């Protein structure tokens, strides 16, 4: 009697397994999951995450992030979705990859059905529900600083009504916050970011003043020295006898970790409209104030290597946030960004510089990054980077695109470069 062999089948990966009995019933949510899930699975795998962690983080995205992404972007229908501040194409989702530590991060702008409508013209509601939901998943997430910064930097209901009566209110750029989560050590680390422009329009208070007032509300007893140094660098009215920035540099974001306040870092972001190496060096050294920090010169030398390899054209970027249309390649370049970490761990504001590559050829960027990885001793990443990134965009010819690599961030910590790459979701 012949014995029938059991049929063999391939074990499904985490994305496929989680999709089989997905609870996502809305079409937009399913589209978001189908678009983001496979790429996230690949990046997690390429970063060396164990299979259990891949399941954990994909499930987190499916259940707690996708439902807050709103209408799925469709070419030619930009006006039908929330115009997010998060990405150049105003899409509320961004994946980034910490190359040095192989940590995956997702940033998103929580959106609900009311976002952008008369019921919630400035998208103030969704983030509350989203943060509360995520905070219930881990006792390491603490929302104290979120509440303080939201109170200080997000427009009130009265200010909202006053803004809506103005004839000069821009249609885009109304968002005031976004979230980010790091997938690390089997858990999640949550961060919040605040955009100040609407609060500035509503109150007339300079953004710099809004930011430092908010920092004071949080409490600065243990970070007075780095706060004072940063304030002197960013404002000529706080003179310490050393150079301060000009009008091309201005504050753009204030962020913090949503964890135990004693461990939470504050991050102060600036934009420089004039892209030039000497100005990037000034951002890094804080106008020369940080030169006595032993790590400053070492980090600056590596940053210069990265700058030279990327070959970003210098120039004045007049339009800091161009009116891009999804599906149309960018035709010009964007600004430099930097953030400064304010923490009791250092008397200096710790800089992180963002070299914005959006608008540059993606293959050229991958070649430059591969060369830098080799110089930095990241040999495995140097060997696999181009092949991996091409697999994340199977329908694109990266020798012809100029929007996939949005930016490269660089800092120098624990005597080694700390590099992250930010990718376009489309």
Curated annotation (Swiss-Prot):
Q: Describe its applied uses.
A: Notoamides have been shown to exhibit antitumoral activities. Notoamides A-C show moderate cytotoxicity against HeLa and L1210 cells with IC(50) values in the range of 22-52 mg/ml, but the IC(50) value of notoamide D is greater than 100 mg/ml. Moreover, notoamide C induces G2/M-cell cycle arrest at a concentration of 6.3 mg/ml.
Recorded metabolic or biological pathway in which this protein acts: Alkaloid biosynthesis
Q: Name one GO biological process term.
A: alkaloid metabolic process
* InterPro entries found in the cross-reference section: Aro_prenylTrfase, Aro_prenylTrfase_DMATS, DMATS-type_fun
Does the record bear Membrane in its keywords? no
The residues that the entry says bind dimethylallyl diphosphate are 105, 191, 193, 267, 269, 352, 354, 418, 422
- Residues that hold substrate according to the record: 94, 195
- Provide the family line: Belongs to the tryptophan dimethylallyltransferase family.
Function (record text): Prenyltransferase; part of the gene cluster that mediates the biosynthesis of notoamide, a fungal indole alkaloid that belongs to a family of natural products containing a characteristic bicyclo[2.2.2]diazaoctane core. The first step of notoamide biosynthesis involves coupling of L-proline and L-tryptophan by the bimodular NRPS notE', to produce cyclo-L-tryptophan-L-proline called brevianamide F.
**Any one GO molecular-function label of the UniProt entry:** prenyltransferase activity
Checking Pfam families in the record gives: Trp_DMAT
Name the UniProt record assigns to this protein:
6-Hydroxy-7-prenyldeoxybrevianamide E synthase notC'
Question: Which UniProt key words apply to this protein?
Answer: Alkaloid metabolism, Prenyltransferase, Transferase
Q: What EC number(s) does this enzyme carry?
A: 2.5.1.-
Q: Which reaction does it catalyse?
A: 6-hydroxydeoxybrevianamide E + dimethylallyl diphosphate = notoamide S + diphosphate
């Amino acid at each position: 009697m012949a014995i029938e062999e059991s049929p063999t089948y391939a074990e499904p990966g985490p994305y496929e397994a989680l999709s089989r009995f997905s609870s996502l019933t809305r079409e937009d949510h399913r589209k978001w999951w189908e678009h983001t899930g496979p790429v996230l699975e690949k990046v997690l795998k390429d970063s060396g995450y164990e299979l259990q962690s891949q399941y954990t983080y994909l499930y987190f995205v499916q259940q707690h992030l996708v439902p807050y992404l709103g209408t799925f972007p469709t070419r030619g229908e930009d006006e039908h979705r929330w115009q997010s501040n998060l990405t150049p194409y105003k899409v509320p989702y961004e994946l980034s990859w910490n190359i040095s530590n192989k940590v995956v991060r997702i940033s998103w702008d929580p959106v609900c059905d009311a976002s952008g409508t008369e019921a919630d013209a400035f998208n103030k509601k969704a983030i509350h529900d989203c943060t509360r939901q995520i905070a219930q998943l881990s006792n390491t997430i603490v929302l104290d600083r979120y509440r303080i910064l939201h109170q200080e930097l997000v427009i009130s209901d009265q200010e909202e009504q006053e803004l809506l009566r103005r004839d000069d209110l821009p249609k885009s750029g109304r968002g005031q916050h976004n979230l980010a989560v790091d997938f690390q050590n089997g858990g999640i680390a949550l961060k919040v970011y605040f955009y100040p422009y609407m609060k500035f329009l509503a109150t007339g208070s300079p953004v710099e003043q809004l930011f430092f007032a908010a920092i004071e509300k949080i409490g600065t007893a243990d970070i007075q020295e780095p706060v004072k140094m940063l304030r002197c660098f960013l404002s000529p009215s706080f003179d310490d006898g050393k150079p301060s920035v000009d009008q091309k540099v201005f504050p753009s974001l204030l962020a913090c970790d949503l964890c135990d306040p004693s461990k939470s870092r504050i991050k102060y972001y600036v934009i420089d409209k004039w892209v030039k190496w000497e100005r990037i060096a000034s951002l890094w050294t804080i106008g020369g104030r940080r030169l006595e920090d032993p790590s400053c010169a070492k980090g600056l030398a590596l940053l210069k290597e990265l700058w030279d390899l990327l070959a970003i054209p210098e120039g004045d970027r007049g339009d800091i946030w161009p009116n891009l249309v999804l599906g149309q390649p960018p035709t010009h370049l964007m600004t430099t960004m930097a953030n400064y970490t304010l923490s009791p761990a250092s008397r200096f504001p710790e800089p992180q510089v963002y070299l914005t590559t959006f608008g540059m050829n993606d293959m050229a960027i991958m070649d430059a990054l591969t060369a830098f990885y080799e110089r930095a001793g990241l040999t495995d990443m140097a060997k696999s980077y181009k092949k991996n990134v091409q697999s994340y965009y199977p329908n694109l010819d990266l020798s012809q695109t100029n929007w996939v690599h949005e930016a490269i961030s660089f800092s120098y910590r624990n005597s080694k470069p700390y590099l992250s790459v930010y990718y376009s979701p489309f």
